[in-house]
Amino acid sequence: MASLGELERTVMDRLWSASGPVSAAELREGLADRGLALTTVHTVLTRLEQKGFVVHDEARPRRFRPRATREEHAAELMHEVLGQAGDRQAALARFVGGVDADEARLLRELLDRG
């Protein structure tokens, strides 16, 4: 999976937080503090679409939405990183060793549900 640059991550955060698909102009308004040109927002959205992070509808103006939820994206990243580990068991052990008691309890519950 392709990585996200800082501006791409900011745009994705806005898309994930939106209640539905949004236009480039709406995204630009939400990023007004950044002083971005509309063409810049379009460029970022095009790159995100090429990387597989967003999809758009055919309406005019185009409205964009994330291809996956934030949680689905995080799960995809975890699977990708685990797939790159030379020793999956060791990687999982190190991961589990770093979780707190509540997260460990949640992991046990999820594993028990299968």
Regions found by a protein language model. Give the residues of each.
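Short alpha-helical segments that sit at the start of domains
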Residues: M1-R14, A18, T69
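Short, hydrophobic-biased segments on the C-terminal half of alpha helices
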Residues: H42-T46
